[in-house]
UniProtKB/Swiss-Prot annotation:
GO molecular function: tryptophan synthase activity
HAMAP family referenced in this protein's UniProt entry, alphabetically: Trp_synth_alpha
Entry's EC annotation: 4.2.1.20
Gene3D superfamilies: Aldolase class I
Protein name, per record: Tryptophan synthase alpha chain
Active site: 49, 60
Pathway(s) annotated for this protein in UniProt: Amino-acid biosynthesis; L-tryptophan biosynthesis; L-tryptophan from chorismate: step 5/5
Quaternary structure annotation from Swiss-Prot or TrEMBL: Tetramer of two alpha and two beta chains.
Keyword Amino-acid biosynthesis listed: yes
GO cellular component annotations of the record: cytosol
InterPro entries: Aldolase_TIM, RibuloseP-bd_barrel, Trp_synthase_alpha_AS, Trp_synthase_suA
Amino acid sequence: MERYESLFAQLKERKEGAFVPFVTLRDPGIEQSLKIIDTLIEAGADALELGIPFSDPLADGPTIQNATLRAFAAGVTPAQCFEMLALIRQKHPTIPIGLLMYANLVFNKGIDEFYAQCEKVGVDSVLVADVPVEESAPFRQAALRHNVAPIFICPPNADDDLLRQIASYGRGYTYLLSRAGVTGAENRAALPLNHLVAKLKEYNAAPPLQGFGISAPDQVKAAIDAGAAGAISGSAIVKIIEQHINEPEKMLAALKVFVQPMKAATRS
């Protein structure tokens, strides 16, 4: 959890926002997946948001569902994902690593055991996409016992009650949703979200990162101008992986070309 605090403090000092890419672990296979993560960090990623493949990803649009299918085709298991997370942490000791996943994968292990494993491999946060705030107690309590930040989604239509709960229970960062629906770069982020950002700040919530539909530098800049601490981009990155699936070197070059201007847009 402390890695998020020190990241946001450093960025504030440098007058920058955070750029956070999302990818699915082991898409399209373990070696290339590790190279992808190294490339994202070299190109300027401030933190990582990583998906553990799940057979029924409700919040994901077709792009990320395809990434999940590719990972399954490569024979992915949650145990292998944790081995991979340990490797990433070893190589990148200071970058915050967040997991974005579904409740079944947490239950499979046993809630406490799952978060214990996260702590062991150096995961900083976990967002369980299909667990609403009001049902989150066993997850967030286990997370905090193991020094893992529980992350909550703040939807664009959040009422005051929900905003207070998110502020009270969340740690690390707050996932500020650009719009309702499933993930996807095709549906551009709807702005502005100034009123939500102001309320979250008022209630002392963890810094908001805006996600869903973030696919261009102007959207990153707009999110930060609206008061967000940064932006998360997933489908646009996963699409690049898909487009260059048979050209691993081209894929890495294209990812670099995408991430550099996205990071540059966080600088005021």
